[in-house]
A protein has these predicted regions:
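Conserved GNAT acetyl-CoA-binding A-motif
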Residues: 2-12
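S-adenosyl-L-methionine
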Residues: 20, 30, 34-59, 70, 95-132, ...
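Class I S-adenosyl-L-methionine
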Residues: 30-37, 183-225
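Conserved class I S-adenosyl-L-methionine
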Residues: 58-67, 86
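Conserved beta-strand signature within the Rossmann-like core of class I S-adenosyl-L-methionine
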Residues: 65, 168-176
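Conserved SAM/SAH-binding beta-strand->alpha-helix loop
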Residues: 91
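Mobile active-site "lid"/loop adjacent to the S-adenosyl-L-methionine
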Residues: 135-158
Length: 225
């Protein structure tokens, strides 16, 4: 369970003011008002929870979009002790950020390898049918220039490579984004591609947050048969 965020405020002496704060979820604890808010389930957490439940001691996992290393670290955490995580990102800043994050967490260097190259080229590094899982978190590098983001032109070939790289029984996950900056082209193109995958070979789950905004991150999961 994710850790709750704690908000505090001075304890008012007036009952009316106390009632006002109660409308916003604050309650008296000792000499202060306290409100605890557990974070909403996020698309990233949803996908991570699914993979953790689905995979038992995977030996080879791929983070196809390293970003700041969150998914890379997650995969290192669920991979078997003798296993390995392979990460890809086209931005050197992302590779450096991921490496720093893993080092801060104390992940042994032998547990992972990072490649500053397109995820569409992952079959140059990974043999077909050998990966237990491949994770994609499309969009842009958090905290970096939003003018640099993934597009359908590279995402579709990367997904094709991932589906070839993963073993039967393995999983490919993809979180799709849309919005004012990146538009809807990648999201719609990827969805069309996923929905056209043959049922005899794949099961595709599109897991939208039905009461969130239309531009909310959209997790997709592909199970290879």
């Amino acid at each position: 369970r994710e850790k709750a965020t704690v908000f505090t405020a001075p304890l008012p002496a007036d009952a009316a003011e106390l009632a006002f704060w109660a409308k916003f979820g604050f309650a008296a604890e000792g000499r202060q008002l306290v409100r605890r808010r557990t974070p909403d389930l996020t698309a990233v957490k949803f996908v991570q929870d699914f993979l953790a439940a689905r995979l038992a001691q995977p030996r080879l996992c791929i983070d196809a979009t390293c970003g700041n290393g969150g998914d890379t670290a997650f995969l290192c955490g669920i991979t078997a002790p003798e296993g390995k995580v392979v990460g890809f990102d086209v931005q050197e800043a992302a590779i450096a950020s991921t490496r720093k994050h893993l080092e801060q967490l104390g992940v042994p260097a032998a547990r992972y390898e990072l490649h500053c190259q397109s995820h569409a080229d992952l079959l140059q590094i990974v043999q077909p049918g050998t990966a237990d899982a491949v994770m994609f978190n499309f969009g842009w590098l958090p905290g970096a220039d939003h003018a640099v983001f993934s597009t359908a032109q590279s995402s579709i070939p990367a997904l094709q490579a991932a589906l070839e790289a993963v073993r039967p029984g393995g999983v490919v996950s993809a979180i799709l984004y849309s919005g004012q900056v990146i538009g809807t082209d990648e999201k719609q193109t990827v969805l069309e591609y996923l929905r056209a995958l043959p049922l005899k070979s794949f099961t595709v789950l599109v897991c939208d947050f039905a009461n969130w905004a239309e531009t909310a991150p959209l997790p997709c999961i592909i199970l290879k048969k």
